[in-house]
Design a protein with these regions (language model features):
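Class I (Rossmann-like) S-adenosyl-L-methionine-dependent methyltransferase catalytic domain
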Residues: 2-51, 56-107, 123-200
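Conserved acidic residues
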Residues: 110
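Short catalytic micro-motifs in class I SAM-dependent methyltransferases
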Residues: 116, 120
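A conserved beta-strand element that flanks and buttresses the S-adenosyl-L-methionine
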Residues: 113
Length: 200
């Protein structure tokens, strides 16, 4: 499929993502639930209240909700939110349009699920994102998901340098799991890892 012509160029603004969802140009979308998340949920005895920032179409929302996990998903793109709500059926109310930096979750959180949110934003905003992660999560809570590692200056997706990302996270989070990913979409193939970080 040919890449549509876009006019919005700043991924820090909703308009950038509105255009892409309007044209159904979402090469980052897994169109399902990744294997690492399936295994992680199966390994956890107690449901974890989870926030999914930058949820996009939100396939994981229905999976977590069906598993009995309290879940809240947000996106600042109204077109993305409408797409997610249309796809999620009975779980549509789990998705809201909101700005991650000012949003207050409706429940205390046990986990934030990272899936193509951090890498969607310019690297200059990452310290602010990680500070907000730390504000939202109490000690012992988890930041779990997929982290994109790449040295290209272009994006999105914006890749991280592993030591640099670890340096940003280490003051407030401890790494508990780090594994390669074998079921990535083409946009992330060979360049993402499943990681679980625990709030200090």
């Amino acid at each position: 499929m040919a890449t549509p012509t876009f006019t919005a160029r700043d991924p820090a603004l909703p308009e950038f993502w509105n255009e892409r969802f309007t044209h159904q140009f979402t090469p980052w979308d897994h169109a399902g639930v990744p294997q690492h998340l399936l295994r992680f949920v199966a390994s956890v005895d107690t449901p974890l209240a989870t926030l999914i920032p930058g949820c996009g179409i939100g396939h994981e929302v229905a999976f977590l909700a069906d598993a009995g996990w309290p879940v809240c998903a947000i996106d600042f793109s109204p077109v993305a939110v409408a797409s997610a709500q249309a796809a999620l059926g009975k779980w549509a109310d789990c998705v809201a349009q909101a700005d991650f930096f000012s949003f207050t979750p409706p429940m205390p959180l046990d986990m934030i699920y990272e899936r193509a949110f951090l890498c969607a934003l310019p690297r200059a905003s990452w310290p602010r994102v990680i500070a907000r992660y730390a504000e939202l999560l109490p000690a012992g809570a988890l930041l779990a998901g997929f982290f994109f590692f790449d040295s290209s200056l272009r994006g999105p997706p914006f890749g991280a340098d592993p030591p640099a990302l670890a340096a940003l996270l280490a003051p407030t989070f401890a790494l508990r799991d780090d594994q390669p990913v074998t079921d990535s979409v083409a946009a992330f193939a060979g360049r993402e890892r499943w990681q679980v970080w625990q709030r200090r």
